[in-house]
């Protein structure tokens, strides 16, 4: 890494997850990691694997995913951004490129992550909305959604709403923000936490929708949170979920296992 021009680059990227089998490289299927590594390889990148802030499942999108790569690049960060975007497929885009210290780790240095989930209320399926939102009809009661969302704020054992990637792994997470907003044709959920369990965001959305529809009580949700007993929840569809932003406060946090949403 001592050669002139070699530096660690932080990439902020966005992608439409619809036609990807998730972010992580796996076999011959199309993934965000495989596309980005192939493109970086054309620009002289030689590492074995890219590092990402968080893993996203098949069909999940991102508007603020973070990756790092070490590259011997003789031009500006802006030029690298342009060179990558000229070569990447239409459903992936690099929004920003900057150099970071060699020790920077996109996952372990993240202080929190923020996910958004979009629901639209229409009696008939809208093809132009379907890639990025979950259609629910009749419309949900926003007040009930907000009532349920507040329960999740704070430090809790979320084992009823997701699982650790490793057996016996820590299932305690701290949620800083959990709230719903009305949109023109539905609502949007925003959640920020220090980290997430496997499928945690989509399970939380599903449970809140069930409560808003009268399928479960607030007591059921509180009990699930207090006792870690699964509510046997389903999963909200991947298409409504976006990894919106990864926050860094300059401190390295404890190394929680990777989460997938």
Regions found by a protein language model. Name each.
Residues 2-261:
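Structured-RNA-binding interfaces characteristic of tRNA pseudouridine synthases
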